[in-house]
Amino acid sequence: MINFACISPHAPILLPDVGSKEDRETVKKTIEGLYFLGEKFKELKPDSIIISSPHPDWGFNVPLYFLARDFKGEIKTFLIGNETPEFYFNQGKEFYTKYDIQNTKYNVALIASGDLSHCLKEEGPYGFHPDGPKFDKELIECLKKKDIENILKLDNIYPEAGECGLRSFCFLLGILETSKINYQTEILSYEGPFGVGYLVANFKLS
């Protein structure tokens, strides 16, 4: 059964061996949110992890550093490509059925790795675009409301947002939707001081 699910940013700057002390202080809320998730992960003791990411290296490594650094169980990685959000939502549904997650006797953790808009500030990696902050705000509101229908449309509504997490999040949401587990989205932190939106969210499962 699924007993843990979350959204995690994956910026290497969050890591103590990469980010400077000053940079990490600037994203203190994000780091605190990730450590909170790490404590939750330890408390719930999942036996295996399913983690999705648009990047094959830091996309997996950064969330796992904070959440499951000493984890010894099985880790299944799912690499996200450029297909539509709806495609990955359906992939999540198929993944749930293919691996018979419903009937497993083990506890499973879901981690959706991804960053929000990279266009929040002129000095950010892709400059500023008004789609950026609008996308981030609406995505967070939709997650709170469990409004999957509109989440799947955000890519078309804000095509210049420059995000890299939406499809990863949709994969996780597809799994949750198929599981029929009731959940509430708890936003632990959101900030974008470097022009990239970092969201940390916990799905409270019941």
Where are these regions (language model features)?
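A short aromatic-anchored loop/beta-hairpin motif
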Residues: 1-60, 65, 76
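Glycine-rich phosphate- or other oxyanion-binding loops that anchor nucleotides, phosphorylated ligands
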Residues: 59-103
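Gly/Ser/Thr-rich active-site loops/lids in small-molecule metabolic enzymes
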Residues: 127-150
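Active-site beta-strand/loop microenvironment that shapes enzyme catalytic pockets
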Residues: 87-135
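Polyanion-binding loop/helix "lid" in catalytic or ligand-binding cores
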Residues: 32-33, 145-190
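Membrane-interface soluble catalytic domains
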Residues: 191-206
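Flexible, glycine/proline-enriched loop segments at strand-loop-helix junctions
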Residues: 24-25, 78-88, 126, 158-159
